[in-house]
């Protein structure tokens, strides 16, 4: 994820795992806009108390029952312990935008063509990953069978952000224009360079022989360059010349 500093020269304050722009019939795979939050390691998220008795088990899903706003946020890489917990490699650091994994009430799992969903009974950070206990996963063997599953969360379950904070997935596809109104292309991807987020913009161009090609621009997502993000208008305005 990334947080754009609204100051004239402020950097993006938080970092994000590099995303891959990829679709699977759902919203684009996205890393998150990262927001510094209180570390949640050792703090369990208990959603079971709010769930009905019939909602605590894993269930099979279809393409039709899959949420239209599902966003891939990680992958199950291993079992954790002996009691059915799973270990997840999150696409954004746990505690820094991987928070959706901690707060979401239901996880949606895709492995090959098989779709499942399960309530998140408990989830917490553990070192550089997230560990969770999902409904219906009663022992280590069941947890091991979930290895390789890609984890999706409904976009509607992402934690709310403050002013001037954006989830990467919400920036993908937006038109980019400069302050003079010149179109610079569309956001194709977001990159984390370690210091701040970077917009990767694609636009139609031609090579030296006149053949159509896709051009690329990289614009740091910081306040000195990014002036406005209008999600309703699907447009980002930047202080950036077309010939840079």
Curated annotation (Swiss-Prot):
Residues 13-22, 45-57 have a biased composition (Low complexity). Residues 1-58 are annotated as: Disordered. This is Ribosome maturation factor RimM. GO terms for biological process: ribosomal small subunit biogenesis; rRNA processing. GO terms for molecular function: ribosome binding. The keyword Nucleotide-binding does not apply. It holds the Pfam family PRC_RimM. The gene is rimM. The keyword rRNA processing applies. One of its GO terms (cellular component) is cytoplasm. Keywords: Chaperone, Cytoplasm, Ribosome biogenesis, rRNA processing.
């Amino acid at each position: 994820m990334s947080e754009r500093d609204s100051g004239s020269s402020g950097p993006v304050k938080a970092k994000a795992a590099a995303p891959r722009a990829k679709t699977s019939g759902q919203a684009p795979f996205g890393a998150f806009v990262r927001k510094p939050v209180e570390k949640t390691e050792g703090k369990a998220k208990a959603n079971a108390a709010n769930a009905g008795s019939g909602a605590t088990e894993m269930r099979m899903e279809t393409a039709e029952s899959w949420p239209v706003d599902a966003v891939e946020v990680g992958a199950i890489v291993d079992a954790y312990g002996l009691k059915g917990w799973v270990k997840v490699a999150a696409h954004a650091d746990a505690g820094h935008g991987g928070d959706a994994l901690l707060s979401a009430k239901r996880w949606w799992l895709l492995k090959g063509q098989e779709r499942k969903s399960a309530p998140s009974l408990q989830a917490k950070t553990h070192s550089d990953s997230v560990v969770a206990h999902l409904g219906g996963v009663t022992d280590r063997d069941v947890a091991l069978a979930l290895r390789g599953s890609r984890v999706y969360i409904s976009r509607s379950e992402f934690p709310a952000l403050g002013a001037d904070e954006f989830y990467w997935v919400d920036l993908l596809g937006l038109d980019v224009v400069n302050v003079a109104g010149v179109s610079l292309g569309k956001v194709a991807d977001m990159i984390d360079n370690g210091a701040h987020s970077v917009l990767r913009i694609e636009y139609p161009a031609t090579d030296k022989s006149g053949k159509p090609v896709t051009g690329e621009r990289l614009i740091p997502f910081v306040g000195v360059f990014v002036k406005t993000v209008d999600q309703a208008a699907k447009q980002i305005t930047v202080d950036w010349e077309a010939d840079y």
